[in-house]
Amino acid sequence: ILFCAHIPFRGGANSGGASVNKDKNYAEILKLLTEFHEAHIMVGHTHYPQNWIHSSYVTKGGTPVYEHVHGAACGAWWSCNMNVNGAPNCYSLYEIEGNSIKNWVTKGTKNEVGYQMRVYNGSQIYGGTDGTPSGKYRYTWYDGGKGGTANITAKGNSNLKGSFVAAIWNDDDKNWKVEFFQNGQKVGDMKRVPSKVPDICVVSYYFNNLGKNTTTWTTTTAQHYWYIEAPGGDPTKVKNWEVRATQTIPTSGEVNVYSCTDLQTDYSGF
């Protein structure tokens, strides 16, 4: 079954915000969905993509109810080529076989299907007097930063200094494996960033280049970030590296592999 709605279920009645109807029967609907062999919730509203697994609600086929929060084709309300969290303006493609979703992908509106991530230098400085690209407000992955006339805070994480940071916008925390390779040999597994952070490069673009001035542009609700310490501690000096992300579709076992071998160091494509 595909259950389509507008506002996400993922926080249910516990979510804040004026858009949430706390009298709606979120839990009751989730329970009803478990009576089917497979269940997917298709929603939008957020202007960023996010996958959410309802682990407490398992279907007759043995897989949890899976919620697909779709990013917007118009992105951040046509202000650039991105959704508010840095994912490209996008839509999703689904391959259905019989009574099951065999495969799916989130596709950027101006990108090839294989474009599924950006990889950053966790030590890079954006904006400020010492940052590249330049700008009024200074941001780093490890310290965060503040910007706009409202002094909006963007959170950082100290673990990210000296690390490769991958933003993978169609990921989830159960069905993806992200690995780091050098010279064709695996160095290690990348880990989820242990605290909520935004895409710092994207935040700098929004505040320094587009003049944004609200917390919408520092969103940390959807976490798509993985990291690993760079060999030698400086990502810019590492040669012949690759971040490889492997997605296993939970309902079919289908496997998708995506790769990135270049650092995103500026706002190109934004």
Question: Can you name each region flagged by the protein language model?
Answer:
Residues 1-66:
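His/acidic metal-ligating clusters that form di-metal
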Residues 56, 61-270:
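Metal-dependent phosphoesterase/phosphodiesterase active-site architecture
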